[in-house]
Amino acid sequence: MPGVARLPLLLGLLLLPRPGRPLDLADYTYDLAEEDDSEPLNYKDPCKAAAFLGDIALDEEDLRAFQVQQAVDLRRHTARKSSIKAAVPGNTSTPSCQSTNGQPQRGACGRWRGRSRSRRAATSRPERVWPDGVIPFVIGGNFTGSQRAVFRQAMRHWEKHTCVTFLERTDEDSYIVFTYRPCGCCSYVGRRGGGPQAISIGKNCDKFGIVVHELGHVVGFWHEHTRPDRDRHVSIVRENIQPGQEYNFLKMEPQEVESLGETYDFDSIMHYARNTFSRGIFLDTIVPKYEVNGVKPPIGQRTRLSKGDIAQARKLYKCPACGETLQDSTGNFSSPEYPNGYSAHMHCVWRISVTPGEKIILNFTSLDLYRSRLCWYDYVEVRDGFWRKAPLRGRFCGSKLPEPIVSTDSRLWVEFRSSSNWVGKGFFAVYEAICGGDVKKDYGHIQSPNYPDDYRPSKVCIWRIQVSEGFHVGLTFQSFEIERHDSCAYDYLEVRDGHSESSTLIGRYCGYEKPDDIKSTSSRLWLKFVSDGSINKAGFAVNFFKEVDECSRPNRGGCEQRCLNTLGSYKCSCDPGYELAPDKRRCEAACGGFLTKLNGSITSPGWPKEYPPNKNCIWQLVAPTQYRISLQFDFFETEGNDVCKYDFVEVRSGLTADSKLHGKFCGSEKPEVITSQYNNMRVEFKSDNTVSKKGFKAHFFSDKDECSKDNGGCQQDCVNTFGSYECQCRSGFVLHDNKHDCKEAGCDHKVTSTSGTITSPNWPDKYPSKKECTWAISSTPGHRVKLTFMEMDIESQPECAYDHLEVFDGRDAKAPVLGRFCGSKKPEPVLATGSRMFLRFYSDNSVQRKGFQASHATECGGQVRADVKTKDLYSHAQFGDNNYPGGVDCEWVIVAEEGYGVELVFQTFEVEEETDCGYDYMELFDGYDSTAPRLGRYCGSGPPEEVYSAGDSVLVKFHSDDTITKKGFHLRYTSTKFQDTLHSRK
């Protein structure tokens, strides 16, 4: 295969491992056993490659191909002093590492620099092209459902526009593995062969355009800007390139790259952006040399394949001149020039691909082809699968219409060939995707119609899954997003334990949370998906497999007391008062216990003496139904501090280790009283093998919980109080007038309180996708709004281009920006210049996180502008409701425009009185600061009714001590024409 000119070879530096140390392939493999339950997978980890060529990682095979002339000691190697030469006989399959903005990452890949040369021209390597355009894939288990959906959307995008096919791997030797590695976005170029090859989708790389770009490398593309003819089309601005990254802009020699006759493509998804590896975000490193349609063409897009990308891929994989990939749930296609006959020597292929779990009905509505024995000359052929070697369902010619064809899976291959000109019509066919059906396999995938895009309205799909006798059916959800409703009345997925609609109901599911794993009691499981005619969501993706219950065997998996079956495995556990022995099967006596009294006490082992090392004690406290348990510590002393890494006490609502956590405590500070969420509580004490302390003593008591029965009648959250309860709604909802139900609130908020808390929608759960919320905060005039972040967990991106919170210094989004925030690092407090602040939160349709929690308050002082319109200024934010607080010092600078002075009119003035105004006072200065002439210090009943400045500004200072407080002051200010002299009137 000639190396396709959409990724650079980057002949920057070849970095070798230490001389004298043999290469061990085990050093460059990564175990996927924990990521994929189907089987352990080993592939070479590009982050541990044997060598690097610029930002390209090389393995042993690549090293042999490159015939390296010189080795370099890694320990002695420095980025600026190395000079290594390599012979490059051909285009090899080498990983290219790239970050979220189209730039190679400065990490394990592409971190060394130097000089190199090629002694021989690149040769054609046809083995790097995927045979028949079929690329098997595996997605590692460490990705979320939304990430998997993005990967599938990107693969379907390539399939839609080319003849490449991405197929879930079964037993193929060569395939790609989507995984998460430190290299960031990193993938091999072309087919490596001889086993799996990694495509790393690292941190912040899980965006549609970025994944499409990385799949371009898998298909066989190099970066566009390294073509030999690039200097005719773009200029490299070398003075703007980051030091040490210049080698990323080398171009390839004419004999090293094959552009397949395509012109330079500014719009290619494989092109670097204008500021790639730039010293600054606004400095260009690549600039187009000429205009296209009157403007300089944009470069570096990560939105979709360009026309040039599509044309080049179709040439590389020798796609038929006619035909296409059909992915809609219904559609039609016909022979060329239908119904006016077709030309000789035509070859067309249509690939029909619908959602896994669906089948295809293909119906020929018109057929008029040259008839021959065995349809030898002109024919249309249908195969039951994804390629030309799939099982043949029929070869047709003549004019007799075939019976409708139903696929056994979600793909059909339709091929048309002609050998002569024919005056007949040709053919016309229609197809439709049908969901549901009988699934008799031990392993497989089922997805909602049209997944990962929104499912279709008014669909009813029923799947009957059957695995081998003697096994159970296991279900694991990869992704789940179905229209939410409290009782799943509209759209839902229903799962039943059997093979019919009358079987035992396991659950009816909707919303955005993935259901727990499901296991049938027999070898059959029944699934039903229903959508109504209105709101459509992304749907679901689920894996099914045969599952055996080890705990049902006579020896209960070898467990002495309890055996807990899990999907794909099992684990042993012990009764309360016992703990697992080191062999993880036997149980031995332990501290703790199972307590059902309404009140009592618990202590650490050995109390009141020091507790022993290596103890693990669990107390399970259970009260009657409708009661809650409160735990109060009388004494507390354990090893540790805030980290609680060594010895600690952990308190949870519930009886299991994954119940709601109230707190993890250590050190010498007594925890506050803890009240359980339900009628049970779990208290766990752990000590390590080093320092021991006195431990703890605590007592517990019970109180009736009205929320435990029918949630107190509350639709969402019920909060128990001693002797009563109250209903509350989550963020994004408000309480109904009946004080029990919740109704959805708008996401545009007006906040007028002087202080409070603001959270992202659905806090503390993940915020929904495609959401935009605003908060317009207004405070008392003269007091600036201050925003302090308590928690921050928003999808991260260097420029916060995806999900983000934006803060504006004013009443709306037209005001100056104070900051745009994302990621998990808490921003510093944000302070407005005035009494208004505007917040806007935005989420896209992919990754969701917990969101943010922030408090807003006020800070006195600042600069305000006076004009002809009268404005107000108050001594404190809660003026009229409370006295001013003690211990404050505030300064306001009131500024008028040039040629105007400032007029102050006091409406209210009540400040602690003292002869010299030495305690609380207001002070006025005729200027910007306290060096200006002082107009006076006032307390008690206050200054004159009106005050005029001699200049264009007035400084107002207010001070209070920490004792007596009063009502404060309220003044109004305007701008006036300058007076000849400063004066005041009463």
Curated annotation (Swiss-Prot):
Glycans are attached at N91, N142, N332, N363, N599. Residues 23-120 form a propeptide. This is Bone morphogenetic protein 1. Residues 322-434, 435-546, 591-703, 747-859, 860-976 form the CUB domain. Residues 547-588, 704-743 form the EGF-like domain. Disulfide bonds join C163-C319, C183-C205, C185-C186, C322-C348, C375-C397, C435-C461, C488-C510, C551-C563, C559-C572, C574-C587, C591-C617, C644-C666, C707-C718, C714-C727, C729-C742, C747-C773, C800-C822, C860-C890, C917-C939. Proteolytically activated in the trans-Golgi network by furin-like/paired basic proprotein convertases, cleavage is not required for secretion. It comes from Homo sapiens (Human). It is found in: Golgi apparatus, trans-Golgi network; Secreted, Extracellular space, Extracellular matrix; Secreted. The active site is at E214. One of its GO terms (biological process) is proteolysis. Residues 1-22 form the signal peptide. It comes from the Eukaryota.
